[in-house]
From Swiss-Prot:
This is NAD kinase. The active site is at residue 53. Involved in the regulation of the intracellular balance of NAD and NADP, and is a key enzyme in the biosynthesis of NADP. Catalyzes specifically the phosphorylation on 2'-hydroxyl of the adenosine moiety of NAD to yield NADP. Its main location: cytoplasm. GO terms for biological process: NAD metabolic process; NADP biosynthetic process. It catalyses: NAD(+) + ATP = ADP + NADP(+) + H(+). The gene is nadK. Its EC number is 2.7.1.23. InterPro entries: ATP-NAD_kinase_N, ATP-NAD_kinase_PpnK-typ_C, NAD/diacylglycerol_kinase_sf, NADK.
Length: 275
């Protein structure tokens, strides 16, 4: 077995901020001459994301075709992020934990997105946080189908479908529930729905179990804006967009420093109670 076969392959991905570059340099120096590690962005075993949650989203999409083989770990160089276990001043702890890593992981569900266009084209994608469909110019009218049952006819700005880890992002700002990331479920949340004596929607978020699927079927021709995490695309004449739990998941390195989900929620939205 050669050196690279024996060593853990590590990819270090950082944003352009000064502090992120400093952390990346320290990690490079620590692993460069360590025989147990091999620095490579090609086919890594571990991806270290340095920056914020946006950087980890980018790292996820960079390696989304290798999810069976890769584990992620995040280092935050700003405020605490939901996908980061380490702050920039905890790099030595991260290095020590990785040197003692035994391959344990924590897995979270991700979203499978299938977009069907009028011309027959099918676009497939994955989202770690969420996906939205909107019609910017006019009110969006679409049937919401859950597990092949027409649930409602939606009228409004758009619809968001989020994963449990994404429930604390855009979904929460829309009044959706916060789900623990180990719950294998999707959440459907309306964006500025029309509700009056003529038009009615449920008006609250819906939690969809793993075995069920969501279909959004637009009822008007036109250009639709579809977001997949931090990327936005525009498609003309969308026939339907399907959402379900993907058969793959995202895996994070499980270390003694792994921060519990509820600690992250507290730090992000509540903070320490006053005494």
């Amino acid at each position: 077995m050669n050196f690279t076969d024996r060593a853990t392959r590590v990819a270090i991905i950082a944003n352009g901020k000064y502090q992120s570059k400093r952390v990346a340099s320290k990690l490079f120096a620590a692993f460069k001459h360590d025989p147990d590690f091999y620095l490579s962005k090609k086919d890594p075993d571990i991806v270290i994301s340095i920056g914020g949650d946006g950087m980890l989203l980018s790292a996820f999409h960079m390696y989304e075709k290798q999810l069976d083989k890769v584990r992620f770990v995040g280092v935050h160089t700003g405020h605490l992020g939901f996908y980061t276990d380490y702050r920039d001043f905890e790099v030595d702890t991260l290095i020590n934990n990785l040197k003692n890593d035994e391959g344990e992981q924590i897995s979270y569900p991700i979203l499978k997105v299938t977009i069907t266009l009028e011309d027959g084209r099918v676009i497939r994608a994955r989202a770690l946080n969420e996906s939205t469909i909107k019609r910017i110019e006019k009110t969006m009218v679409a049937d919401v189908v859950i597990n092949q049952v027409v649930f409602e006819r939606f009228r409004g700005d758009g619809i968001l479908v989020s994963t449990p880890t994404g429930s604390t992002a855009y979904n929460k700002s829309l009044g959706g529930a916060v789900l623990h990331p180990t719950i294998e479920a999707l959440q459907l949340t309306e964006i500025s729905s029309l509700n009056n004596r003529v038009y009615r929607t449920l008006g609250s978020s819906v939690i969809i179990p793993k075995k069920d699927a969501i279909e959004i079927v637009p009822k008007r021709v036109g250009v639709y804006t579809i977001s997949i995490d931090n990327k936005t695309v525009h498609y003309k004449n969308v026939t339907k967009i399907e959402y379900s739990i993907d058969e793959k998941s995202i895996n994070f390195v499980s270390t003694p420093s792994h921060t519990s989900f509820w600690e992250r929620v507290n730090d992000a939205f509540i903070g320490e109670p006053e005494h």
